[in-house]
């Protein structure tokens, strides 16, 4: 049977309400309740100072002795070994941040209400560090000369079996790997392509398949001149004067001959006998035309002789 004047035990695992000693109203009741909680549950944590702590006014029945939150961000408390509950020997209480899902590392509040985590030398266990990037390796001038000579010789994409041989030549002047040789040729090929696209007059690069991408203007002109066949135009001769042929046929017979020749040309399928007959008729007609002139000329000659 419970004694008079002792408050009944709490019905839940935690008790809400102000648990501070500086309360102006109901301070005796709070002190009596704390004393009763300490007697009934010797392993209990009583958190107070809600305005300063930021965790809230609550008493957690965690199976440990009464303690207050420390002023630091994190603190470690020892638990008595006589505790009836099976709990770990060490408990870490973190005030900032109060969320149990965040990693145990020191954080800093940001202006926007966020929470940024930063690594701490005290909480470096289990964290993964990003390795620092390797410094870029610059080839030596002797190695660049060897690579340029190989590239200009026509080997733009060296095969796999050639890359180790090139690396052995370059290792005489410094340490180099097969990957460095491969990437140098890739970068050199892209630089030559960009130079050709921008209209540069440098050395012509080679394409992916080993074909010549372009040629300089002078070389292309010489190549076209050598391939094109030599053509020499014929000499221009002065025009020769046309000598007129003397026509012995009388002008009266000319139309007849022209008509006969045109008729012969138009009738290509006429027989040779018809052509001969036409020529004989033209000659007879010409003689008939000339005969009156001869007759009139004879009396005149006779009159002169008389």
Swiss-Prot record:
Any one GO biological process: regulation of developmental process
Cited Pfam families: Homeodomain (PF00046)
Region (Disordered): 1-20, 103-142, 190-276
The name this protein goes by in its record: WUSCHEL-related homeobox 13
Pro residues: compositionally biased ranges: 1-11, 231-242
Biased composition (Gly residues): 199-210
Task of the protein: Transcription factor which may be involved in developmental processes.
SMART domains for this protein: HOX
Major location category of this protein: nucleus
Keywords tagged on the record: Developmental protein, DNA-binding, Homeobox, Nucleus, Transcription, Transcription regulation
Top-level taxonomic group: Eukaryota
Organism: Oryza sativa subsp. japonica
DNA-binding region: 132-196
Gene designation per UniProt: WOX13
Bias (Basic and acidic residues): 126-142
GO cellular component, one term: nucleus
Family: Belongs to the WUS homeobox family.
Compositional bias ranges of the Low complexity kind: 243-270
A Gene Ontology molecular function term of the record: DNA-binding transcription factor activity
Subcellular location: Nucleus
């Amino acid at each position: 049977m419970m004694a008079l004047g002792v408050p009944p035990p709490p019905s839940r695992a935690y008790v809400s309400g102000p648990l501070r000693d500086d309360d102006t109203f109901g301070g005796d009741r709070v002190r009596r309740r704390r004393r009763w909680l300490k007697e009934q549950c010797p392993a209990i944590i009583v958190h107070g100072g809600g305005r300063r702590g930021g965790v809230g006014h609550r008493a957690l029945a965690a199976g440990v002795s009464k303690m207050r939150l420390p002023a630091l961000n994190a603190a470690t408390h020892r638990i008595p070994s006589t505790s009836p509950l099976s709990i770990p020997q060490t408990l870490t209480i973190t005030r900032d941040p109060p969320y149990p899902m965040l990693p145990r590392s020191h954080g800093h509040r940001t202006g926007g209400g966020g929470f940024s985590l930063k690594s701490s030398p005290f909480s470096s266990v289990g964290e993964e560090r990003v390795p620092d990037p390797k410094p870029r390796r610059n080839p030596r001038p002797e190695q660049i000369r060897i690579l340029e000579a190989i590239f200009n010789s026509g080997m733009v994409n060296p095969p796999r079996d050639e890359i180790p041989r090139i690396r052995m030549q370059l290792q005489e002047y410094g340490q180099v790997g097969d990957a460095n040789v491969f990437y140098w040729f890739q970068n050199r090929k892209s630089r030559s392509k960009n130079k050709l696209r921008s209209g540069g007059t440098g050395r012509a690069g080679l394409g992916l398949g080993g074909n010549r991408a372009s040629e300089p203007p002078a070389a292309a002109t010489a190549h076209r001149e050598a391939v094109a066949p030599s053509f020499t135009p014929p000499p221009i001769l002065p025009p020769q004067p046309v000598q007129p042929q003397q026509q012995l046929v009388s002008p009266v017979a000319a139309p007849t001959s022209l008509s006969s020749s045109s008729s012969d040309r138009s009738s290509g399928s006429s027989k040779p006998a018809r052509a001969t007959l036409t020529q004989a008729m033209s000659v007879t007609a010409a003689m008939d035309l000339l005969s009156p002139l001869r007759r009139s000329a004879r009396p005149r000659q006779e009159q002169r002789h008389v």
